[in-house]
Structures are given as C-alpha cells and as structure tokens.
C-alpha cells in the first residue's frame, strides 16, 4: 500500500490487535527515553554544589521531575542536598531509570507479540464475526484504572502512607526536601502553592474516576448518543484523547511558567515574575532590616543572608532572559557561579545611599542610573561624557560591600565603582567561572522556560490535531461524499438507474 508518511496509521485503523501493538511500542519508547535520558543527565550532572550550581543551572530536564516525586539519592553516593549516603536502594535516580529501561524492553516484547498475534477472538464481534472494539466498555476500563492510579498516588505516595512523599519547600526555595504531605480539604487546597492540594485533589479525582469508570462499565449509552458522538469510530477515541492531552499541556505550561507547588524553584529555577516583582529582593531587605533592628551591624545582617537566597535575586536566573534559540544550560551562558561577592551599597560624596536601577526582564542593555531613597537620579554612567552632570567621577560615588567574599571592602576608584554599578543592574553580584565550560556570556533559559515553550508548542499542535480528527469522525460522510445509509443505492451496477431502489438488477 503506497501511503504517504502522514497517512501510515491508516493500516491500524480497523486492526485492533496491531493498534494495541503500536501503542505498546509507543509506551515502550517513552519509557526507554525517560530511563536513557535520566542516565545521560546523571552522567553529566555535578552534585557538588546544590546552592550555586543546582540542577536547573546545569540544564537538567528529567532529574527535576524525578526529584519532585520523592527521589533524592544516587548510586553514586550523593543525595540532592549535597550530603554523602551509603545505601540509596532501588528508589534512587539510577534505580528508577533502570526500571524504566527494563519496562521498555518488556513493552517491546509485548508489542512484538501483539503484532504477530493480532487476530485474537477478543477483538471480534460475536454477532458479526468482524473485527470490532467495544469502545464504551474500553473507556470505562481505562477510566477505572486511571482513577485507581490517581487515588493511589494521592492517598499513598504523596501522603507518605506507602511512599516517600513529594518535594516541599518554603516560599523562598531555601529549605526544600522530600516529605509526606497532609491533604488539604478546605478552600486552602485550591491554592496552587499549597502542596496539600496535590494530595487532596489526586484523592478526590481518583475517587471520581473510579466511580465514573464503574458507571461506564455498567451503563450502556443510548443508541442516539452512540450515533451522535460516533462512539463506534476509533477516530473518535483519537480525537477526544488528543483533546485531553492538549488541555493538560496548556495547564502545565501555566503552572510551570507562573509557578506552583508542583514546580518548586529549587528544582526548576525561579519564575520571571519573581524578578519582575522584586520578590527575593524584598525578602532579603526585610531580613536585613530585622537583623539591624535587633542590634546587628550591616555587615552581620548581610552575612546572615543565605547565599541560596541571594543567588535567586540575580537576573541570570530569570528564565525569560534566555532566548528560545539559545541552546544549552544556564551555565553555558554566564558560567558556573563561584561565590557571592556581597551586597553592594553605593554612596555619593554627601553620604546619600544610592540604589542602582535594576534591568527589566526584556532588556539586553540598560542605562546605569543610581537613585536616592526618594527616587531622584543622583548619578549615572553617561552615554556622552561631554554633557554629563551626574557621572560617577563628578558625583564622587563609592561602593562598599556587606556580606559575601568582599565583606567590609570599600572602593572609591571610579573605574571599579562603575564596574560594580553595571553588575548591580543584574541583582546581587556573583563571581562566575566562564572558563570551565567555555561559557559565552549570553544568558540561557532554565528548564522552566524550555518546558513551558515545548508544552505550549505541543498543545497548539495537538489542539489542531483534535479539531482535525474530530471533524473527520463527525463529518466522515460529508468528506466521503456519500451518505453511509445510502451505500447500497450508489454501488456501481446494483441498479439499472443509479440511486433508484425500484430498478434493482436481478442476479443471473
């Protein structure tokens, strides 16, 4: 059969046995990819510095998803928090990757078996003897089984009743770890940042799926509904399945990009809105002010700020700063973070504290402007020095560092002050190693950005796929040009006059 590449699935349209075979093979390919990709990422992942070189800076894609489900240990003797371990067991990165590859092999064998033994009695309608699938019953079976899985995940895995729990963190991504979750059954369960909602919603959705599955197994659709929704056509199944997938892809694109309890910043990196809103900057300043109010010096207050929190407050970790066509991990852009230099405080010669205006997300270059506490421009780095009135040299700006590696150091040299003013545009100032990976200095996106972009593209593609296959199954008679109820009347040679049932030819 000379089919074009986009029509090859036609061969399994009316062949239930081989339809199952290709689906098993597809599941095996997905499972094999997941296991293989996990092993690849483990081979290139550096677990030595979970604070300044976390998985999302290294461009890991599979590892964050494994970690959020409760996997945190490796056969390499490390865990995700940088500690040494002795007995990781099967529930480890390598253990789960290996089980996926083994599953892929079993799926491959099962697919081969179903391809060879395609003509099973199970797939034949006992009334007609022709290949047929009881699609409403199959729908009920799948709904029941997926409901069981959903309920089991929420009731056992997430709650820790039989499982590790999931990754839970504080709002600022400092204290994250794997722990059991208590289901939230109140209105707070609908808060997208409340992990308790993950448990309760899986339990509730699982129960609903089980009940709906039992309903569809025990109640047959009316003939009118069966005909109206084309329940006898396997392309109806394809169309509605694609609808479920594209809807899920749109939803997870949103929860990833805007952030949620299921997409913690310790595993996927911060969101762009946390930079836009000064989320970490406000928290850092709040902690510093509280420390100073309790009697600490500025140096002591800034030294208490966790390096992890300071690193989040850096524009290079904003997923919207990396272009969609800049391939590679964040570390391939600005380099591997080596250390926090400390918080830079600028002052003019009159003693006023100045604040560098931070670069907005969608700027590649931005003027260096220093403002006082009232928002008045006091200094800048001018484009045309001949007309400048607020240059660093004219205003006499100095910079002092609190906390970090340069704690207590002050610079008054205009060249050095300008260097740190430019870097302060990008948030907290860090030192980067650009030599090790030959980093090019151009920002990259995090797995959060890549996941969102990929799933939005696939969701759009699958949306059109749903429309296409839905239209094909609903309007099949229109596209064929023949009413399915008139097939005998228009059969060539059945009647003396085409379409006239009163002129049927007599068999000789």
Curated annotation (Swiss-Prot):
GO biological process, one term: photosynthetic electron transport in photosystem II
Pfam families: PSII (PF00421)
Molecular function terms, GO-annotated: chlorophyll binding; electron transporter, transferring electrons within the cyclic electron transport pathway of photosynthesis activity
Key word Thylakoid present: yes
Main location: plastid
GO CC annotation, single: photosystem II
Transmembrane regions: 21-36, 101-115, 140-156, 203-218, 237-252, 457-472
Compartment annotation: Plastid, Chloroplast thylakoid membrane
Similarity comment: family membership: Belongs to the PsbB/PsbC family. PsbB subfamily.
NCBIfam families documented for this protein: PS_II_CP47
Primary role: One of the components of the core complex of photosystem II (PSII). It binds chlorophyll and helps catalyze the primary light-induced photochemical processes of PSII. PSII is a light-driven water:plastoquinone oxidoreductase, using light energy to abstract electrons from H(2)O, generating O(2) and a proton gradient subsequently used for ATP formation.
Subunit structure: PSII is composed of 1 copy each of membrane proteins PsbA, PsbB, PsbC, PsbD, PsbE, PsbF, PsbH, PsbI, PsbJ, PsbK, PsbL, PsbM, PsbT, PsbX, PsbY, PsbZ, Psb30/Ycf12, at least 3 peripheral proteins of the oxygen-evolving complex and a large number of cofactors. It forms dimeric complexes.
UniProt name for this protein: Photosystem II CP47 reaction center protein
Taxonomic classification: Eukaryota, Viridiplantae, Streptophyta, Mesostigmatophyceae, Mesostigmatales
Gene label: psbB
């Amino acid at each position: 059969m000379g089919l074009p590449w986009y029509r090859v699935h036609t061969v399994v349209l009316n062949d239930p046995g081989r339809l199952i075979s290709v689906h098993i093979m597809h599941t095996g390919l997905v499972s094999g990819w997941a296991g293989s990709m996990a092993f690849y990422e483990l081979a290139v992942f550096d677990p030595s510095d979970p604070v300044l070189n976390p998985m999302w800076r290294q461009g890991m894609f599979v590892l964050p998803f494994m970690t959020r489900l409760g996997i945190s240990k490796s056969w390499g003797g490390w865990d995700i928090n940088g500690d040494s371990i002795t007995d990781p067991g099967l529930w480890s990165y390598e253990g789960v990757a290996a089980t996926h590859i083994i599953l892929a092999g079993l799926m491959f064998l099962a697919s081969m078996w179903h391809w060879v033994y395609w003509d099973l009695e199970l797939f034949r309608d006992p009334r007609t003897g022709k290949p047929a699938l009881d699609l409403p019953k199959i729908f009920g079976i799948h709904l029941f089984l997926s409901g069981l899985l959903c309920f089991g995940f929420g009731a056992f895995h997430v709650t820790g009743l039989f499982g590790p729990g999931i990754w839970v963190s504080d709002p600022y991504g400092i204290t994250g770890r794997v722990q059991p979750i208590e289901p939230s059954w109140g209105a707070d369960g609908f808060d997208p940042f409340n992990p308790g909602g993950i448990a309760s919603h899986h339990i509730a959705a699982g129960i609903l799926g089980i009940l709906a599955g039992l309903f569809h197994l025990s109640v047959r659709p009316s003939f009118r509904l069966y005909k109206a929704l084309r329940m006898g056509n396997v392309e109806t199944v394809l169309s509605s399945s694609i609808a479920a997938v594209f809807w899920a892809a749109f939803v997870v694109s949103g929860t990833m990009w805007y952030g949620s309890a299921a997409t913690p910043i310790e595993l996927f990196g911060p969101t762009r809105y946390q930079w836009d809103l000064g989320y970490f900057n406000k928290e850092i300043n709040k902690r510093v002010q509280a420390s100073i109010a309790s009697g600490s010096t500025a140096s002591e207050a800034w030294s208490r700020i966790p390096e992890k929190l300071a690193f989040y407050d850096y524009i290079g970790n904003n997923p919207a700063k990396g272009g969609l066509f800049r391939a590679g991990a964040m570390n391939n852009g600005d380099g591997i973070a080596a250390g926090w230099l400390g918080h830079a405080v600028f002052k003019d010669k009159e003693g006023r504290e100045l604040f560098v205006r931070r670069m907005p997300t969608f700027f590649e270059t931005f003027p260096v402007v220093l403002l006082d506490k009232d928002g008045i421009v006091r200094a800048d780095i001018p484009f045309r020095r001949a007309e400048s009135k607020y240059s660093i040299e004219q205003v006499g700006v100095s910079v002092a560092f609190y906390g970090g590696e340069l704690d207590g150091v002050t610079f008054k040299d205009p060249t050095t002050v300008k260097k740190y003013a430019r870097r302060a545009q990008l948030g907290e100032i860090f030192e980067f190693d650009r030599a090790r990976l030959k980093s090019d200095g151009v920002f990259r996106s995090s797995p959060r950005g890549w996941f969102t972009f990929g799933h939005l593209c696939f969701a759009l593609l699958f949306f059109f796929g749903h429309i296409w296959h839905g239209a094909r199954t609903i309007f099949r008679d229109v596209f064929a040009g023949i009413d399915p109820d008139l097939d005998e009347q228009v059969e060539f040679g059945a009647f003396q006059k085409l379409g006239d049932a009163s002129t049927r030819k007599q068999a000789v």
